[in-house]
Amino acid sequence: MWITQEITPYLRKEYTIEAKLLDVRSEHNILEIFKSKDFGEIAMLNRQLLFKNFLHIESELLAHMGGCTKKELKEVLIVDGFDLELAHQLFKYDTHIDFVQADEKILDSFISFFPHFHEVKNNKNFTHAKQLLDLDIKKYDLILCLQEPDIHKMDGLKRMLKEDGVFISVAKHPLLEHVSMQNALKNMGEFFSVAMPFVAPLRILSNKGYIYASFKTHPLKDLMAPKIEALKSVRYYNEDIHRAAFALPKNLQEVFKDNIKS
């Protein structure tokens, strides 16, 4: 048996699977979980793949990309995603997390897939809301958008950031779909003084890129090495990974030179 991952409209990968473990469908999402000899369990959410053995890569990178460039991380907002492992990593800081996800049926179906599902959901500093309007009005130190935001969502979310807050969003991979990344950077630059693309170094099973944006905080100049060294129980993230995430080959430096704001 095989499952197919669409990397771009013109590039696909296939993975061998042994069995389907779960099939859950809601109004807006489809979740299938498969057993794989090489990758443990594989979750397919709306044709995007999550590998249980490698969940820590994205969750560590995004959480500590924000946490280690901020002196304080008191209030965090996560929108448009299901990744509770990201919240688990963020709880390494003294923080409160607002997690916005309307599809409770799909979220609860990840109960056996996310290793820290119960630990996160039962944390007193974790608030799950179905929509942003259900939350108290506040400003955030870090906002993570786990789907590509359109320009209207960017505008709304940036208004919820503190002056030194950090906004991290998913984008297309800069090498695979550089035009899409270029457009995303251009849009982000309409709202932020800092807008820089990055990827997860050595992550071979992903088609994702990301953007780090802020009014004043810089992902490299404001990196705090002592905070990185103090992190416990991390398997992927370190200072070298953080810095390498922003490295671009010469040709992409030229492509993005008018869109990167640093």
Curated annotation (Swiss-Prot):
**Pfam families recorded:** Spermine_synt_N, Spermine_synth
Which domain of life, per UniProt? Answer: Bacteria
Residues in domain PABS? 1-249
Q: Which PROSITE patterns match?
A: PABS_2 (PS51006)
State a single Gene Ontology molecular function: spermidine synthase activity
* Catalytic activity, as annotated: S-adenosyl 3-(methylsulfanyl)propylamine + putrescine = S-methyl-5'-thioadenosine + spermidine + H(+)
- Localization per Swiss-Prot or TrEMBL: Cytoplasm
| Predominant place of localization | cytoplasm
| Keyword field contains Transferase | yes
The active site of this protein is located at D155 (proton acceptor)
Fetch the Gene3D superfamilies from UniProt.
Answer: Spermidine synthase, tetramerisation domain, Vaccinia Virus protein VP39
The residues that hold S-methyl-5'-thioadenosine are N29
The EC number(s) attached to this protein equal 2.5.1.16
* Chain positions recorded as spermidine binding sites: D83
The record, for PANTHER family, names: SPERMIDINE SYNTHASE, SPERMIDINE/SPERMINE SYNTHASE
Q: What function is annotated for this protein?
A: Catalyzes the irreversible transfer of a propylamine group from the amino donor S-adenosylmethioninamine (decarboxy-AdoMet) to putrescine (1,4-diaminobutane) to yield spermidine.
Report the protein name in the record: Polyamine aminopropyltransferase
Annotated organism of origin: Helicobacter pylori (strain Shi470)
Lineage of producing organism: Bacteria, Pseudomonadati, Campylobacterota, Epsilonproteobacteria, Campylobacterales
